[in-house]
Amino acid sequence: DTILTLWLGHIPEHAQIFVRLMLFLALTDAISYPLITAILATGDIKRYSLLAGGFNLLNFPLSYLFLYLGNPPECTVIIAIIISVGCLVIRLIILNEKLGISFNQYLKKVLLNVIITGIISSIIPLILYHEIMQPIVRLIVVILGSLVSSLFVIYWIGCTSNERNFVKMKASQFINRFRK
């Protein structure tokens, strides 16, 4: 609310839910990008483009239909999220056929990891949000708390030991640049 108030002054009726839904849509799309890259690397671009592109084309007519039937405007973003998840499933099916990537393995190693990391890293910012009443101070503290909480949880829970070693190596290289 604070960011929207600072940015817009007066918050339009559906702005808050739109922003939340758009952030969720961005997350679902971000999870898909590595899958898109893997599919393109297999060379099966035509089939992927027909399936995912065709499925994406449903966005406009479905949104129009749902708005025509009297649903609230945010239904368009919900439809986009459903289509994005559908495209994610299409990508996983293609990758299973081409590279043998298991749907269940992807759910466990990627999606479950993202969900658990997201939930745990949200605990401290939510506590801060409910404990601090001054809007500007709350905004700054919640942003900093989110940053610290997310970095900590991603590093210790979201990363494998190999990924943590990679981060340590890169951090060490970065620090050593300034020691010279």
Predicted segments with their positions:
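Membrane-interface helix-capping segments at transmembrane helix termini in multi-pass transporters
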Residues: 4-19, 130-141
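Short runs within selected transmembrane alpha-helices of multi-pass transporters and secretion channels
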Residues: 17-67, 72-98, 117, 121, ...
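Membrane-spanning helices that line or support transport/gating and their immediate boundary helices
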Residues: 2, 6, 34, 163-166
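Short, amphipathic, aromatic/basic-enriched membrane-interface segments that mark the entry/exit
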Residues: 43-51, 104-112, 136-137
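Short membrane-interface helical motifs at transmembrane helix boundaries
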Residues: 1-10, 65-68, 127
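Membrane-proximal transmembrane or re-entrant/amphipathic helices at the cytosolic face
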Residues: 96-103, 107, 125-180
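Conserved short cytoplasmic inter-helical helices of the MFS fold
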Residues: 2, 11, 43-47
